[in-house]
A protein has these predicted regions:
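Glycine-rich phosphate-binding active-site loops on the catalytic face of alpha/beta enzymes
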Residues: 129-136, 287-294, 342, 348-375
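Active-site glycine- and acidic-residue-rich loops that bind
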Residues: 192-207, 235-237, 263-281
């Protein structure tokens, strides 16, 4: 029994219940398994029907608003942690000089405003990538930003890097409470607007955002997003020469933390090699996130008037080919964050087997529910115990 202390908050009391001691070591797995199962059942049978009958743009706004309120309710974050945390030393990783509680994280794109950090930390995520954040305010594309493709376990995305600006978003995310060791990365990119000189203007915006995250002690790492297929005024950083120009400018900085680069998705993974060669030549780059949204609609039933690119299961094959290509051609030069089409626990484990050091997801959050992270971790523990 946890003694009541008038100086303890409700969150503190529940956190005390989750610490390892002789009285609760055997009880914790039972609580966690029951909590994960209950959350999964509740999501699939009660929440998901509402999710799939709500306009996706509106649903995203409601989710952010819910998380902002939920983290302020006494005891709720502690209860979330109690139900979902799956603890094991076998999950922990030391990568890029950082200690990850587990190798699974949230990709950039869902938490554009930095409002989900406390909830994700409480739910046991290993890391979160906030953003993408732009150097200056970026309105993004005209609505709608999202369309669901349930038959294909996918989502059409046409947001176009909306951002309040890196200074505002970074301050919000880095000041959020993180009591359970989740690491925080900041994704940086260019504002979605036309410049007098498009390449120079975009690079300048990258640098503004980079400088904010680089100097913010609340962030553990930086992800440079060179894959922005929904920008209205072109995507120059699918060209290796332009990537080199951008990286040369960033290399002039005094870089204070690990740097990843989020790469574009190609149906033929070999098209990545010129970009990877450029990245490999810049010593400050620690790793790559492969890969972003799929552009090619071949074989997919998508209305012609739906703008955007594809997230979810249809990205799986080409992005996993990219993971294998990076590991085969560059050995241990890059830390690999595998993203794209990671829906089930088996998908997450397969990416690790193919050479990824870290695995991120977004679309599974909608199709599987918020307990997905606990399911991934539990699957990894079970496999390593065999």
């Amino acid at each position: 029994m946890v003694p009541m202390n008038r100086n303890h908050s409700a969150n503190d009391i529940i956190d005390d219940m989750t610490t390892t001691d002789n009285t609760n070591t055997e009880r914790k797995p039972v609580i966690h398994n029951a909590g994960i199962g209950l959350m999964g059942w509740t999501y699939m049978h009660l929440v998901k029907p509402y999710v799939f009958h709500t306009e996706p743009d509106k649903l995203h706004e409601q989710m952010v608003s819910f998380c902002k309120v939920a983290e302020k309710i006494p005891g709720l974050m502690g209860l979330l942690h109690l139900f979902t945390e799956v603890e094991s030393g076998s999950l922990e990783r030391d990568i890029m000089g950082l200690h990850f509680m587990n190798p699974f994280g949230l990709s950039a794109g869902l938490d554009k405003t930095g409002n989900l950090t406390t909830c994700l930390d409480s739910a046991g995520w290993g890391f979160e990538t906030v953003g993408t954040m732009t150097g200056t305010y970026s309105k993004g594309n005209p609505r709608p930003w999202y369309h669901r493709l349930p038959e294909q376990t996918a989502l059409m995305v046409h947001a176009g890097l909306p951002s309040e600006g890196a200074e505002i978003v970074a301050k919000r995310a880095s000041s959020a409470k993180r009591k359970h060791g989740m690491l925080l990365f900041g994704s940086v990119g260019p504002s979605n607007k036309q410049y007098e000189n498009q390449l120079d203007g975009m690079i300048d915006d990258y640098l503004k955002a980079f400088d904010v995250i680089n100097t913010d002690v609340g962030f553990n790492g930086i992800e440079i997003n060179i894959s922005c297929p929904n920008l209205q005024f072109g995507e120059p950083f699918t060209d290796a020469h332009n990537v080199n120009t951008l990286m040369d400018e960033i290399a002039k900085r005094q870089i204070n933390k690990p740097v990843m680069v989020k790469c574009p998705s190609f149906m033929n993974a070999n098209e990545l090699i010129p970009i990877l060669d450029v990245l490999a030549a810049h010593a400050f780059i620690n790793g790559v996130s492969v890969c972003n949204l799929r552009r090619d609609r071949t074989g997919l039933q998508i209305p012609d008037d739906w703008l955007g690119n594809i997230s979810g299961l249809p990205t799986q094959e080409c992005n996993e080919n990219a993971i294998k290509l990076v590991r085969k051609n560059y050995d241990d030069r890059f830390v690999i964050n595998g993203i794209g089409g990671t829906i089930t626990p088996d998908d997450a484990l397969r990416k690790l087997d193919e050479g990824a050091d870290l695995v991120s997801g977004i679309t599974a959050f909608m199709y599987r529910g918020p307990q997905m992270m606990a399911e991934w971790k539990r699957a990894l523990i079970h496999r390593e115990q065999k």
